[in-house]
Amino acid sequence: MNVKEYMQQLGQAARKASRLLARADTNQKNAALHAIADAIVREQEALLAANRQDLDAARQAGLDDAMLDRLTLSAKGVLAMADGLRQIAALPDPVGEIDDMCYRPSGIQLGKMRVPLGVVGIIYEARPNVTADAAGLCLKSGNATILRGGSEAFHSNQAIAACVHEGLAAAGLPAEAVQVLATTDRAAVGELIAMPEYVDVIVPRGGKGLIARISAEARVPVIKHLDGNCHVYIDDTANPDKAFNIALNAKTHRYGTCNTMETLLVHTAFAEFMLPRLAEAYWEKGVELRGCERVRAILGEPVKAATDEDWATEYLAPVLAVKVVKDIDEAIEHINRWGSHHTDAIVTEDYGRSRRFLREVDSASVMVNASTRFADGFEYGLGAEIGISTDKIHARGPVGLNGLTSQKWIVLGDGQVRS
């Protein structure tokens, strides 16, 4: 069987399973999630052995330390996967929820019911835990899923898939509800993103190159974000302590996440007071600063000159671009021009400016007096997330269970006909 035939077979099976899964009630889905979690705990040694096999191959292939870190499963990580599935089971089931019921003049009753998307294709790199997270979220939201993990995590993903299938069987659900590709052939990705008759949406999770390729080539809708070029703007009305703590946390809490601040904007009236204090804190943590001419005039030689490339870059590293702006107008203009529409924050004590920032900054998450690091499914109360979307359709921001559903109109009548 060639790759095209294999993927067609998976797609057909997923479509059939999606119809069965859409009918499954909450108790059955939760039973499957708990059974999968139990299987993961029970098969911990097998999972770790499979992961060691992947790690050995990765080292022989010369993968860097960052990739090895993402690939590594620990005993603690295995238990965390199981706990994550139990947390998904504890979340409210969005499927079947009915909103906005109302009577129309004709006498019909109208509303919207939340329903699964159908079949979700998920393409990701390195992290084996994504296999369990993605399977759990799709299962709870009533979607069948086809998972394509990175080839470097092949054995880990297959071992996790075996636990998933064991849990599905225990709950009386079809194994085809969650299918993990049993091939490392890259042609499988091209087939997966070009099967609109079987796949309803694609969610890519990985590097910019992967996501850009899928966005360009997919014949199926894509939920994605390319970059996390996030900003914090410190207004001249900001509380100095709030500004310091937020600007420090947003950059240094973790460097490699998509909600980490990459550019700091400071009002000109606040710059000479705030920048030296912040710079010392950044330098203590090993953060390299790249600034505009005004920033360099205030802070001196340690600051490299920032270029347009710096304003546009998601560093994912201890590097920060810093710019002094004359007012909120320039701050908003800079963010909307150079940002990635992911997450941006203002620090201000002025109510009018905070509301203006919320209205005019064109990002999936816009914050007032809070760190950009809060842009996260768990922090938003969504539970686990499948990813973060910077698109405006279909989902925007952290995508949890609700983001894996859509709504259909329902009409209840009592014999009405249209005149």
From Swiss-Prot:
Pfam families in alphabetical order: Aldedh (PF00171)
Matching InterPro entries: Ald_DH/histidinol_DH, Ald_DH_C, Ald_DH_N, Aldehyde_DH_dom, G-glutamylP_reductase_CS, Glu-5-SA_DH, GPR_dom
Pathway: Amino-acid biosynthesis; L-proline biosynthesis; L-glutamate 5-semialdehyde from L-glutamate: step 2/2
Subcellular location: Cytoplasm
SUPFAM superfamilies on file: ALDH-like (SSF53720)
Keywords of this entry: Amino-acid biosynthesis, Cytoplasm, NADP, Oxidoreductase, Proline biosynthesis
GO cellular component: cytoplasm
Superkingdom per UniProt: Bacteria
Enzyme Commission number(s) from the entry: 1.2.1.41
Catalytic reactions on record: L-glutamate 5-semialdehyde + phosphate + NADP(+) = L-glutamyl 5-phosphate + NADPH + H(+)
CDD domains in alphabetical order: ALDH_F18-19_ProA-GPR
GO terms classed as biological process: L-proline biosynthetic process
Regions annotated as coiled coil: none
Main enzyme class: oxidoreductase
One GO MF term: glutamate-5-semialdehyde dehydrogenase activity
Cross-referenced NCBIfam families: PRK00197.1, proA
Protein family per UniProt: Belongs to the gamma-glutamyl phosphate reductase family.
The protein's role, per its UniProt record: Catalyzes the NADPH-dependent reduction of L-glutamate 5-phosphate into L-glutamate 5-semialdehyde and phosphate. The product spontaneously undergoes cyclization to form 1-pyrroline-5-carboxylate.
Listed name of the protein: Gamma-glutamyl phosphate reductase
Species per Swiss-Prot/TrEMBL record: Chromobacterium violaceum (strain ATCC 12472 / DSM 30191 / JCM 1249 / CCUG 213 / NBRC 12614 / NCIMB 9131 / NCTC 9757 / MK)
